[in-house]
Each structure stands twice: as C-alpha cells, then as structure tokens.
C-alpha cells in the first residue's frame, strides 16, 4: 500500500525576522562577530541579510556575521 505523500508546509516566518524588519530605516550600531562595529542605517532586511548604509556606502551584511545590534 502506498501512503499518500504529504505536501510540505511553507516555513513560518520566525519572530526574529519580524523584529529585524522593524529596524528598517533606523540608525543602529551593529557589532560583527569579527569585532568590527558598524554605525549604520538599516535600509532593508531579508531572511539571511541586512542591507545597511554606512556613510555614503551601501553594505550587505549576512545575519550570521552579526553578534548583536544596538539601537
């Protein structure tokens, strides 16, 4: 007997993503895992990256490279 194949449910959005999205447009201080600190403005957030503006440069920072964020 063949069992019916269940369709995979779409992944739910984790609360941390919603929290990070609220930082959009705010000035923050991002502490990276390598010890660097970025004084930046958050311009965009996706599942794995945060887009920030540091001075006149736009940077794409991977979330796994972030230690913590102060705002």
Curated annotation (Swiss-Prot):
GO molecular function (one): RNA binding
Biological process, per Gene Ontology: regulation of DNA-templated transcription
Record protein name field: Uncharacterized protein MJ1435
Gene3D superfamilies in UniProt: 2.30.30.100
InterPro entries associated with the record: Hfq, LSM_dom_sf, Sm
Sm domain segment(s): 15-71
The organism of origin for this protein: Methanocaldococcus jannaschii (strain ATCC 43067 / DSM 2661 / JAL-1 / JCM 10045 / NBRC 100440)
Any one Pfam family match given in the protein's UniProt record, by short name: Hfq
